[in-house]
């Protein structure tokens, strides 16, 4: 079993962000009280036993804008249920992840930290609505290493309207300088979501395939191993196990405002309104996924990652199309699974196989 916890609070709302996030306010104490109730209920409902939780991911929002002591009771609840080799990830922003916060979170059990850097360039940071700077990024990474984190991720965003070869070379130069301080990189192609500050501003996205190819190629030349369209690690042992579980279609519980869980072909949605969540944190609306939904999800997630496609989950006409892709060398076959050697065309392949 895998577990996700959502912390919705942020110092400010980034222009591209479509996740549920709120400015820190008087609801923080009430939220954590509701969150604990939610977690306890979910653990009982799904009968989670000792050593069953393989990964725990605390995301947001910005978990680092909340004092570490707020997480103590949550960890006390979860400790007996964590696998001895559990991966515990927590998102953080460079400006709010202080040395003390990092130290306290590590003492609680967090062993993987993920920094929402997004860019090293001041103009691009401003464009994205980020409130940190390059000095803060370096300081946060140094502090994470100082307190003993062995698994450190850094996020970058590319394909914005500001991106050209010169801008991407700037990002790569600074990434190279701090490469020794990280073990993992998430590089996301900017997506314009409907409920963001960038909505109705499609021109804010570059849509430049050649620049995307250039950027990915340069990341690989920095000796990062690409295991998903947006994720790179220095070694296979430093892959994010939690995200891998998503792509493998594993069961995961999710608690917190606007959280989405998955269990036995069903999706579980918590309340999207803060007051509603605080009043009734155990509420879930349930979506039963059809075999068609599951097949489509398996195709999209498998083709964009090293997970691949399980041949037993394909129907005959999909297998016929797969054979065409094999002949064209757009896929390869190994151990009863089909793999995509070029993640950049994953959506195109998935649509072809599902149509």
Regions found by a protein language model. Name each.
Residues 18-44, 54-313:
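C-terminal scaffold of the Radical SAM
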């Amino acid at each position: 079993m895998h577990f996700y916890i959502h912390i919705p609070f942020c110092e400010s709302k980034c222009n591209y962000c479509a996740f549920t996030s709120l400015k820190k306010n008087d609801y923080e104490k009430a939220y954590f009280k509701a969150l604990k109730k939610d977690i306890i209920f979910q653990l009982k409902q799904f009968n989670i036993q000792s050593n069953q939780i393989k990964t725990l991911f605390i995301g947001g929002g910005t978990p680092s804008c909340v004092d570490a002591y707020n997480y103590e009771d949550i960890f006390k609840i979860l400790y007996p249920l964590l696998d001895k080799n559990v991966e515990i990830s927590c998102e953080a922003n460079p400006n709010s992840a202080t040395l003390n916060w990092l130290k306290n979170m590590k003492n609680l059990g967090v062993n993987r930290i993920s920094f929402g850097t997004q860019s090293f360039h001041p103009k691009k940071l401003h464009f994205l609505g980020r409130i940190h700077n390059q000095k803060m990024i370096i300081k946060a990474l140094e502090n994470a290493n100082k307190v003993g984190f062995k698994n450190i991720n850094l996020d970058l965003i590319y394909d914005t309207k500001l991106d050209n070869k010169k801008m991407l070379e700037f990002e790569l130069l600074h990434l190279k300088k701090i490469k020794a301080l990280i073990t993992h990189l998430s590089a996301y192609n900017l997506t314009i979501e409907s409920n963001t500050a960038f909505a109705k501003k499609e021109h804010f996205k570059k849509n430049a395939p050649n620049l995307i190819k250039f950027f990915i190629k340069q990341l690989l030349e920095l000796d990062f191993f690409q295991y998903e369209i947006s994720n790179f690690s220095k070694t296979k042992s430093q892959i994010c196990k939690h995200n891998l579980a998503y792509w493998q279609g594993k069961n995961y519980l999710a608690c917190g405002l606007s959280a989405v869980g998955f269990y036995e072909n069903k999706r579980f949605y918590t309340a999207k309104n803060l007051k509603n969540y605080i009043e009734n944190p155990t509420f879930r609306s349930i979506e039963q996924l059809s075999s068609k939904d599951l097949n489509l999800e398996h195709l999209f997630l498998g083709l964009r990652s090293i997970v691949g496609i399980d041949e037993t989950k394909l129907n005959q006409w999909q297998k016929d199309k797969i054979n065409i892709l094999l002949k064209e060398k757009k896929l390869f076959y190994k151990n009863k699974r089909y793999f995509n050697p070029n993640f950049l065309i994953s959506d195109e392949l998935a649509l072809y196989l599902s149509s």
